[in-house]
Amino acid sequence: MKQTNADKLGTSFGFIAGAVFILSGILWPSEFSNLALWLESSGEAESYNKYMIQILRFFDLKSIFIVMGGTVSATFIAFPYRKALRSFGSITKIFSADHAEHATQEVYDQSKIIAEKRYSGKRITNDDLNNLENPFMRRWIEGLIVREQVEDEALHQILKSEVAMYEQRADEEIEILDFMATAAPAFGMVGTIVGLVLMLAETGSIRSVMQAMSIAMLTTLYGVILSNMVLLPIASKRKQLKESNLILLEMIRESVHRIARREAPYTILQELHMFLPHKRDEFDQQYG
């Protein structure tokens, strides 16, 4: 019930915020929207470098309200707000996209240590667990091997379910990013229409007409840039990260499952060997 109420709140927030952003794009004073035009009208432009003024011409508050505000608001309307917030947070994950590739070697080395202790009948200590850098591996080793909580088949299903759960969450984040990439150019067109209507309604100076025209042009530019240079690349990077992490989680699942069965370290390491990046590259070159 709490989740349902939270989703309703997020949807309501999206509608209200979207209306506020669109109305702000319409009603915000044009003289305070485009920074370069404001500097020129106030006589302050001469104190700035001409290249800086050219750059500032592309900064427009009305366009930002409509495109960015509209895109975010539509996302909260379309998706449960917790998932929407999580997708925004996932943007930071793209900067660790290469981590999973390096983590496979760490898992391989740590599996070797744990497998040797498990096979020889030695107790796995808290220090051993603390040395496991991957949180999935640490939790699975602690809960499923050290405490001997479940049987072999149940262990296999638990690990498989957790990997599937991660894949589902990653797919949801990618879906939301793809939605935002589609929505951004659409709101760019909304801003273009708003700018054209304001321009046609303008009966004052040429400067006022140019201010309205800048909104029409810049919203389209913002929508295209936000979609094609920000959101689509981030979604693509997130897909790559998902695939890398699925390989890593599958490697950990295989390792934990075999360690729990007290298989020989050599056998375990032979199975894990193909998960290492250089071995996958060799396989792709040979059979790709």
Language model features with spans:
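Large intracellular
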Residues: 1-10, 24, 28-173, 245-288
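Helix-termination/interfacial motifs at the ends of transmembrane alpha-helices
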Residues: 2-46, 166-240
